[in-house]
Design a protein with these regions (language model features):
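Short, acidic, small-residue-rich periplasmic hinge/interaction motif at the N-terminus
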Residues: 37-116, 124
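N-terminal periplasmic accessory domains that precede
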Residues: 123-126, 154-157, 185-190, 211-232, ...
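Short loop/turn motifs that connect adjacent beta-strands in outer-membrane beta-barrel proteins
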Residues: 224-227, 240, 256-259, 400-403, ...
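Surface-exposed, low-complexity loop segments enriched in small/polar and acidic residues
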Residues: 180, 272, 281-289, 338-389, ...
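Short acidic/polar hinge/loop motifs at secondary-structure boundaries
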Residues: 173-201
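Extracytoplasmic beta-strand/coil segments of soluble accessory domains associated
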Residues: 99, 127-173
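C-terminal beta-signal and adjacent terminal beta-strands/loops
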Residues: 517, 796-798, 879, 925-942, ...
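C-terminal beta-signal and terminal closure region of outer-membrane beta-barrel proteins
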Residues: 4-6, 155, 632-633, 717, ...
Length: 1024
């Protein structure tokens, strides 16, 4: 039966592909016939777009978007004169090609004018300022990572649903992912040729396929650019860092009477980044807002006082900059830079208990407040990753018949970044022998007096160089396709087909990182024949050199090269994406209320990856053998995980998908009395090689009411997100867990298990229901120049892919959650019991809120001033963002308004532009509302607190202020070809609010708050 199933499925795929090929051959044949009928005549307008969702005119898909921001709007109600009937008008969010069609899905538009006025070196920054974008990643995120490779990766998150649930397109086409989660890097796009960016704030899986749960961000390039243009820009912060140097150029020219068009672009961008601070609380280059804000746990849950207290200047008391004895009779003995012992200042009245547990009386669990903060490592994380990016782009298009084009594009890009996760290499819980020759004599004597032979020790390891992570991402993308129109059955049909092959290579190299087995052997020193050597004879034979971690003395070169090898961890990942698409659209039928529009097509895609790591990180394997760079070493584990930080492991996987879709728009009403209305519906059937068949659909409509300028719109959809390569085929990581509880025995027993973190190839796609209702006010007679829209949205995502810890997996199976029971075997017939930590389709997300957009344009001559003024404001209010783990006993959490996350209650963007003659002036406001650390907390004061629970812990304060930023800029045209410009972001140099955690870290939400401070941009543009 399985073989029959596979054969039938394969045959079904072949039939679909054959049908698609037949459609395209018929289309090309019709076009070729048109060419035979007569020579092509040059057209004064651009041919139809090369992607099925792109208009040739830069038109707003939302009437609330003013022309100053979205580009000049075509008159969609009156076709231009001539036989062609005008270019097709297509809006992102729909595959329909029809003049005058208004999609029911809201779309926000950023045109080339607004992108230029914002003067950002990466268009990504401008787009993420839209309120509907929440939780996007960029140069200020992932700066504490050692092995993710996502440092500096620019990716969008709509509605706070995450980058993996936002589909990003280039000219309506998919782009190979920049890492194994499948999200592309916007900084690798040809940015100078971007004509506009459409942001679809609603589900679009029926039109575009997987990942379009939160919406779609579509970058639309100018495919018929003529001439030459260039841009050179620089900038830096008010602190003198993150220096920017940007060079961009593009050229385009037509040949053969306009039938052949060639365009190229290239750019180089350097952003210097903001370095990490050092130890303690000193930030880089004079920034002053960091104060080690921490939620300290009092350990009290039922004494009438808050369990958690917000404390500034918190310090972890398990280590210091140059070393601290953390338990036993010598607890509280710290060491200065010269290795001399002194009593450590714990602050907050802390007194070491000098017991085996390392308790500090007068302090909180794990933390004291104040005292000697010099060893804190939290601020030692890079604040913004430096980035060097370069890309080149080329496109060649040839009109083989009027309004029919074949084309090819190539895009090659590279992004280099780096970051420092933390200073030194903090170590806690170390055991140092009192006889260690590096231990000062007076401490050795104190050991003897106390009757101990060793002590517990912690250090920030300030004697070691800082970890230096270097990820490099390279992209190679090739697209070939054809699009155009032909006549069939008395009407015009538009076709579009393309094949894309994309390659992304990510290389991660880490410098200055400890090899743990070498470090552990090096710190255990002894004296042999009058020389200080490593105590372990096997390690000595393998080249061990002793390391003194007591004090801040210089580390000898041979010791440093032993504990920090010249060749640190590396990880090489190669991803490929192949995609084919063939679609057609037309108007096969005309009703009294207007033409019925139809679009349909087939798509196929294959995704694959392979990652290879070093043998010390991954373990020895065929792909990761020992070598001269990583020689065999008896002290190093052959199963991997030997480095101080990071997960470096081999892995591979692939899947393919084939899809068919159709969309129809039916105008069913058109009268002066009742206005005009249409129904838009789409469906998509998708077959994944990993999870089978799933459907997505959309139904919506618009009603242009009889009240001029007022339109109502509504849409509801079922959207999907398929599991990505990382979730399906994650590289395995294995660790041994002792004292694991087996709930299936009576009484419960403890056993040693092998914990394997792996992918789950049985994952199913996430499904979502997305509903939006809106009203649009556009240029009414009573309010000329004014446009506005209001849209309510509601999204529920089911089967959200999430991960549980090993013990919870086993416990839930015991409690009856049977889908988890295949993930472990605690009583195998042979071998070690194991638990596989995998992702499962267990959780759900619910979010709801509304978007508001308004704009006003006016000529200032009516008030006696020159020029033209445009005002635009966009706002998003998140009413709910509820995440339910979907497991027994777990409580759903609403994070709307939690400014420690991605979804503040309100987010607003306001822009005001004044254009007069050669001068253009811009003001911009960016704001999000005050919020809380988390909605799960119960605020109370000492004496009136309820019982604190894991789901609803008590806290003394729960306020997290928002941020208001003011930007100002302008440009001046020296000539028709030459323009200078300047802009200041965060004019008033507003600092972020701390985002306290229960441990010491950088403690700021870099995805939400501006952490750089005032930034100056300046540049010059040339265009002819």
């Amino acid at each position: 039966m399985e073989r029959l199933h596979m054969v039938s499925r394969s045959a079904w795929r072949r039939r679909l592909l054959a049908t698609g090929a037949g459609v395209m051959l018929a289309a090309w044949g019709s076009a070729a016939g048109a060419q035979v009928a007569g020579p092509p005549a040059p057209s004064p307008v651009s041919p139809t777009p090369t992607a099925p969702n792109l208009p040739t005119t830069t038109q707003s898909a939302d009437p609330a978007a003013p022309p100053a921001l979205a580009g000049p709007a075509a008159n969609t109600n009156t076709p231009p004169s001539g036989d062609q009937g005008g270019p097709d008008i297509v809006v992102t969010g729909s595959r329909i090609t029809s003049a005058g069609f208004n999609a029911p899905t809201p779309t926000q538009v950023l045109g080339a004018a607004q992108l230029a006025k914002n003067a950002e070196p990466n268009i990504f920054t401008t787009v993420t300022q839209l309120p509907s974008l929440q939780g996007s990643t960029g140069a200020t995120t992932n700066t504490n990572s050692t092995s993710s490779g996502q440092q500096g990766l620019s990716s969008f998150s709509l509605r706070g649903l995450g980058t993996i649930r936002t589909l990003t397109l280039l000219d309506g086409q998919r782009v190979v992912g920049a890492n194994v989660t499948g999200v592309p890097d916007i900084s690798q796009f040809p940015q100078l040729l971007v004509q506009r960016v459409d942001v679809v704030t609603g589900g679009a899986s029926a039109s575009y396929g997987s990942d379009a749960v939160g919406g779609v961000v579509n970058f639309i390039t100018d495919k018929h650019f003529e001439g030459f243009k260039a841009n050179a820009a620089g900038g830096l912060t008010t602190y003198g860092d993150d220096g920017e140097a940007l060079l961009q150029a593009a050229a385009g020219k037509s040949f053969l009477d306009g039938r052949l068009h060639v365009e190229v672009s290239g750019e180089y961008d350097h952003q210097g980044g903001v370095p990490a601070g050092g130890f303690g609380e000193q930030m880089a280059n004079g920034r002053h807002w960091y104060n080690t804000a921490t939620l300290v746990n009092t350990g009290q849950t039922n004494n009438g006082s808050p369990q958690y207290l917000l404390k500034d200047h918190a310090q972890a008391y398990q280590y210091t900059k140059y070393g601290l004895i953390t338990a036993g009779p010598l607890q509280g003995t710290a060491f200065d830079v010269n290795g001399r012992p002194f009593p450590f200042n714990y602050g907050s009245g802390g007194v070491p208990a000098r017991n085996a547990a390392g308790t500090v009386n007068g302090c909180y669990v794990g933390f004291c407040v104040g005292g000697d903060l010099s060893g804190n490592v939290g601020i030692g994380t890079t604040l913004q990753s430096p980035i060097d990016r370069a890309n080149g782009y080329g496109r060649v298009g040839f009109d083989f018949a009027p309004d029919n084009e074949i084309y090819a594009t190539v895009n090659v890009a590279q992004v280099k970044s780096s970051n420092q996760p933390n200073p030194g290499a903090s170590k806690t819980g170390l055991t140092i022998q009192c006889a260690n020759p590096f231990v000062p004599a007076e401490v050795q004597q104190a050991c003897g007096n106390a009757g101990i032979t060793s002590f517990q020790y912690g250090t920030s390891n300030a004697i070691l160089p800082n970890i230096d992570v270097h990820p490099t991402r390279k992209q190679y993308r090739f697209v070939g396709g054809a699009d155009g129109r032909f006549g069939l059955l008395g009407t015009d049909w538009h076709y579009d087909t393309y094949y894309e092959h994309g390659i992304n290579i990510t290389d991660i190299h880490v410098n200055n990182i400890l090899l743990n087995p070498h470090f552990n052997n090096a710190i255990q020193a002894t004296t042999l024949n009058g020389q200080v050597v490593c105590a372990n004879a096997t390690a000595r034979a393998a080249g061990c050199q002793p390391l003194n971690i007591i004090g801040g003395g210089a580390v000898p070169a041979d010791t440093l090269s032993y504990v920090i090898p010249e060749n640190g961890p590396f990880q090489h990942t190669r991803q490929t994406q192949d995609a084919f698409s063939a679609s057609m659209s037309g108007e096969p039928l005309t009703l009294p209320s207007g033409p019925v529009s139809l679009a349909f097509g087939l798509e196929w895609r294959r995704e694959a990856y392979k990652v290879v790591a070093d043998p010390y990180g991954n373990g020895v394997s065929d792909d990761s053998p020992y070598s001269d760079a990583y020689p065999a070493d008896p002290t190093v584990s052959t199963s991997g995980a030997n480095w101080y930080a990071g997960n470096y492991h081999d892995g591979q996987g692939k899947y393919h998908v084939i899809e068919g879709f159709a969309e129809i728009n039916v105008p069913f009403l058109k009268s002066e009395r009742f206005g005009s209305a249409n129904i838009n519906a789409a469906g998509r059937v998708t077959n994944y090689s990993t999870s089978g068949t799933i459907w997505a659909w959309k139904v919506g409509g618009t009603w242009d009411t009889p009240i001029e300028g007022i339109r109502l719109r509504a849409v509801t959809s079922k959207d999907v997100r398929a599991p990505n390569l990382s979730e399906l085929f994650a590289a395995p990581i294995s660790v041994t867990v002792p004292n694991f509880t087996n709930p299936f025995t009576t009484p419960q027993s403890q056993l040693l298990v092998l914990q394997n973190t792996i992918g789950n190839s049985a994952l199913k796609p996430e499904t979502a229901r997305n509903t939006e209702l809106g009203v649009v006010l556009s240029h009414t007679p009573l309010l000329p120049g004014f446009s506005a829209s209001f849209d309510y949205y509601r999204i529920r995502v089911n089967g959200v892919i999430s991960t549980l810890d090993a013990q919870r997996e086993v416990n839930l199976c015991y409690q009856g959650v049977t889908e988890l029971c295949s993930a472990f075997n605690l009583a195998p017939a042979s071998g070690t019991p194991y638990v596989n930590i995998q992702s499962f389709n267990l959780a759900s997300i619910f979010t709801a809120g509304f978007d508001i957009e308004a704009s006003y344009q006016m000529s200032l001559d009516r008030i006696g001033l020159p020029g033209r003024m445009t005002i635009r404001a966009l706002a998003t209010n998140v009413r709910h963002f509820i995440t339910d783990p979907g497991i027994p006993g777990a409580v759903a959490i609403d994070t709307a308004g939690a400014n420690s996350g991605n979804t503040p209650s309100w987010k607003l963007l306001g822009t005001e532009t004044w254009d007069v003659g050669k001068f253009s002036f811009l003001m911009q406001q960016r704001w999000f509302s005050d919020g809380v650390f988390g909605n799960q907390y119960v605020v109370c004061s000492a004496g009136n607190c309820p019982v604190s629970t894991a789901d609803h812990p008590t806290i003394d304060t729960n306020k997290m202020p928002g941020q208001f930023l003011f930007d100002i800029g302008g440009s001046y045209s020296l000539t028709k070809k030459l323009q200078i410009y300047a802009k200041v972001d965060n004019l008033f140099n507003k600092s972020p609010t701390g985002s306290p955690q229960t441990n010491t870290g950088i403690d700021v939400n870099q995805a939400l708050y501006d952490t750089l401070g005032r930034f100056y941009h300046f540049g010059i543009r040339y265009n002819f």
